[in-house]
Amino acid sequence: WKDFESLTGIILEEKDFDVTKNLILTQPRMEIDVVGKKLDLALLIDCKHWKNMGKSTLDEIVKKQIERVKRFVSIENMSALPVIVTLHQETIQFIENVPIVPIMKLSSFLDEFIGNLDSLKSIDG
C-alpha cells in the first residue's frame, strides 16, 4: 500500500501540489497518508486499497478522516478538504460531501475540484 500512497503523491506533484506523505499529528496521535498543499488549500488524503468497501465501512473511514482534517486545520492556518482515494471504483462517490475518488480518476478530480469547492466538504483553519 505504500506504493499506492507514493502514486497518489506523484499524481499530486504532477498537478503542482506540495506533497507530504505519512504526516503524523500528535495529541491524539493521527496519521494522514498524503497531504497535498496548493496555495492556501490542503487536500488530506486517506488511501484505501481494499476491494468492495460497503457504505458502513466508508462512513467510518470518512468520519475518521474528517477528524484528522479538523486536527490538521487547528494547527495549520489553511483550509483543508478530506479526500478518500481508492484503488477500485466504489459505487458511492460522496459521503457527507467528502469525495471517494478512484486512483485512476484522481488526476481529473484534481483538475476539476477547484470549480466544485462549494459542493465539497471544506474545513477552515
Indicate residue ranges for each PLM-predicted region.
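Acidic-basic catalytic patches of nuclease active cores, encompassing PD-(D/E)XK
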Residues: 1-23
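Acidic-residue sensor for enzyme active/binding pockets
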Residues: 5, 31, 46
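Extended, folded domain segments that form the structural surfaces/walls around functional sites
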Residues: 9, 37, 55
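A short beta-turn/loop motif at secondary-structure boundaries
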Residues: 25-28
